[in-house]
C-alpha cells in the first residue's frame, strides 16, 4: 500500500517529538497500520531545525503552500494559538486535507466553525493530543464509552498548576515561590497566566464536555478561576481536615443544564484524584453503565503528546478507507444530534464549600456567623477555630453541606458586613466525587 504522507506545521517540542516517534517506531507503526507514514513536507520558522529533524522532507516557509501540496494527505497542525493556525487548518480542510491537531485553544474557541466545514468536505479532524497529552481520553469519550450516558467528568488537566499545588502542600511554600521554581524547572512559562488562571484547563474541559453531552463547544460560558490567589494556609488546613486542593475541571449534566467550570477544589484525600501529584494529569469519568473510570498519565511533554499525535495519524489512515457514514463522529454524536444545551451560571450550581474567616476573637462571633449561614439555608458540616493570629483576631474554618452557590455567596456577603469580621472571606468549592 502507498504510504500516508503528512505535512507538519510547526517543529517545536511536539512537532520534533512526532518526528522522533515516526522515526524510532517506524517498524512497529507499519506492523499495526500495514503501510508507512512518511513526512513529506514541513513548515517552521527555522529551516535548519527542519533539515535536522527530517532531511528527506520538503521544507516550505509558507503554511498555505504546505496545505495545498498534492503530496500531503494529512496536515498535522502544531503551531498552537488561533491566528495562523486557524487559517491554515481551515484552508487545509477546504483543500480536502485531513487534520491532526494538538491545539486545544483552536478547537475550544473555533471548533464550531472547524467541525461543520470538515463534515461538509468529508474530512477527518483528530485531536487526541489536545486534551491531557498522552492520555487517550478523547478516544475513550468518543468510542470506548459510546454505550453510556455520561454523568460527569472531573479532571486534573494542567500539569503546571498541579505541580505548584503539590509543592505548596509538600513544602508549605508560598505560591509565588513555587511558581519561580516551576519556571526554573521548565514546568511553567515565563508568562504563566494561561496555565495558572485556568484558561488551559478550561479549553480542555470544554472539549470533553462537548464530547460527553453532545453539545457545540461552549468555552465562552466556561467558568474560570485559577490558583494564583491560593494561600498556603488553606492547603495546610485542607490537609488537616482530610482534603487536598487541586485545580479541577468539572462538567456535569444536571436536570437544569450542564455545569462547565474550572477552579481550585477540595477533594477528599481518599479519592484517587486527590493523590495525583506533580505534573501528572488524571481524568475521572462517571457514566451510567460502566460506573466510574479513571485515566492517568503524562499530560504534556514531547513524547507523550507526540504519541497521541501519531496515534491520530494512524486512525485517519484507517478511517479514510471507510465511507463517511461509518466514521467516528468528530464530537462523538451524529452531527444532527449535536444540540445546544443550557450551561448553568455559577450561581445555580450545587456544591459544598470551604470557608476561611478572620474575625475578632470575642464572645458571640461564631454565633453571628452561624446564624447568617442558617439564614441562607446553609448547613454547617464542621466549624473549627484554628487559633488566634494577633491576640485579637481568630481564624475560623467552616465546611458546609451541599448548597446552591447563590446562597453561600449571599451568606458570605452578610458575614463580611459584620463589624467583627476583619478580612474578606476565602471560599473554595468542594467535590466529593461520589456522584
From Swiss-Prot:
GO biological processes: methionine biosynthetic process; threonine biosynthetic process
Disulfide bridge positions per record: none
Protein name: Homoserine dehydrogenase
Annotated catalytic residues: 204 (proton donor)
Enzyme class at the top of the EC tree: oxidoreductase
Phylogenetic placement of the source organism: Bacteria, Pseudomonadati, Pseudomonadota, Betaproteobacteria, Neisseriales
Residues the entry annotates as binding Na(+): 128, 131, 133, 135
Catalytic activity: L-homoserine + NAD(+) = L-aspartate 4-semialdehyde + NADH + H(+)
Keywords in alphabetical order: Amino-acid biosynthesis, Metal-binding, Methionine biosynthesis, NAD, NADP, Oxidoreductase, Sodium, Threonine biosynthesis
Gene3D superfamilies reported in the protein's UniProt record: 3.30.70.260, Dihydrodipicolinate Reductase, domain 2, NAD(P)-binding Rossmann-like Domain
EC annotation from Swiss-Prot or TrEMBL: 1.1.1.3
Species per Swiss-Prot/TrEMBL record: Neisseria gonorrhoeae (strain ATCC 700825 / FA 1090)
Annotated binding of NAD(+), by residue: 14, 301
Domain of life: Bacteria
Domain ACT: 354-429
Binding residue positions for NADP(+): 14, 104, 186, 189, 301
Regulation: Neither NaCl nor KCl increase the activity. L-threonine and L-serine do not markedly inhibit the oxidation activity.
Amino acid at each position: 500500500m502507498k504510504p500516508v504522507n503528512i505535512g507538519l506545521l510547526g517543529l517545536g517540542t511536539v512537532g520534533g517529538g512526532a518526528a522522533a516517534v515516526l522515526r524510532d517506531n517506524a517498524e512497529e507503526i507499519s506492523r499495526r497500520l500495514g503501510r508507512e507514514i512518511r513526512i513529506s513536507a514541513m513548515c517552521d520558522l527555522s529551516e535548519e531545525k527542519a533539515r535536522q529533524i527530517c532531511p528527506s522532507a520538503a521544507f516550505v516557509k509558507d503554511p498555505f503552500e504546505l496545505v495545498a501540496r498534492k503530496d500531503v494527505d494529512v496536515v498535522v497542525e502544531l503551531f498552537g494559538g488561533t491566528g495562523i493556525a486557524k487559517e491554515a487548518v481551515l484552508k487545509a480542510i477546504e483543500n480536502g486535507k485531513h487534520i491532526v491537531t494538538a491545539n486545544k485553544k483552536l478547537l475550544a474557541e473555533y471548533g464550531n466553525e472547524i467541525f461543520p466545514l470538515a463534515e461538509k468536505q468529508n474530512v477527518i479532524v483528530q485531536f487526541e493530543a489536545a486534551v491531557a497529552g498522552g492520555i487517550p481520553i478523547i478516544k475513550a469519550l468518543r468510542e470506548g464509552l459510546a454505550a453510556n450516558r455520561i454523568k460527569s467528568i472531573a479532571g486534573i488537566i494542567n500539569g503546571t498548576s498541579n505541580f505548584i499545588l503539590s509543592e505548596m502542600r509538600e513544602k508549605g511554600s508560598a505560591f509565588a515561590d513555587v511558581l519561580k521554581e516551576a519556571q526554573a524547572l521548565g514546568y511553567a512559562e515565563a508568562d504563566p497566566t494561561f496555565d495558572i488562571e485556568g484558561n488551559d484547563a478550561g479549553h480542555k474541559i470544554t472539549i470533553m464536555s462537548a464530547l460527553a453531552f453532545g453539545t457545540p463547544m461552549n468555552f465562552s460560558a466556561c467558568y474560570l478561576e485559577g490558583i494564583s490567589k491560593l494561600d498556603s494556609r488553606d492547603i495546610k488546613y485542607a490537609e488537616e481536615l482530610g482534603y487536598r486542593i487541586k485545580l479541577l475541571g468539572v462538567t456535569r449534566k444536571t436536570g437544569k443544564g450542564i455545569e462547565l467550570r474550572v477552579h481550585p477544589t477540595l477533594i477528599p484525600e481518599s479519592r484517587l484524584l486527590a493523590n495525583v501529584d506533580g505534573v501528572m494529569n488524571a481524568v475521572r469519568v462517571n457514566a451510567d453503565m460502566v460506573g466510574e473510570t479513571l485515566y492517568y498519565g503524562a499530560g504534556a511533554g514531547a513524547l507523550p503528546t507526540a504519541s497521541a499525535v501519531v496515534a491520530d495519524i494512524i486512525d485517519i489512515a484507517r478511517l479514510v478507507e471507510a465511507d463517511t457514514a461509518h466514521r467516528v463522529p468528530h464530537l462523538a454524536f451524529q452531527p444532527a444530534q449535536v444540540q445546544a444545551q443550557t450551561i448553568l451560571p455559577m450561581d445555580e450550581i450545587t456544591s459544598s464549600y470551604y470557608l476561611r474567616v478572620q474575625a475578632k476573637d470575642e464572645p458571640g462571633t461564631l454565633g453571628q456567623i452561624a446564624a447568617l449561614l442558617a439564614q441562607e439555608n446553609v448547613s454547617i458540616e464542621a466549624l473549627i477555630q484554628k487559633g488566634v493570629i494577633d491576640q485579637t483576631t481568630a481564624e475560623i474554618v467552616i465546611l458546609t453541606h451541599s448548597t446552591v452557590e447563590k446562597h453561600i455567596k449571599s451568606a458570605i456577603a452578610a458575614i463580611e458586613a459584620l463589624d467583627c469580621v476583619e478580612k474578606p472571606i476565602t471560599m473554595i468549592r468542594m467535590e466529593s466525587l461520589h456522584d
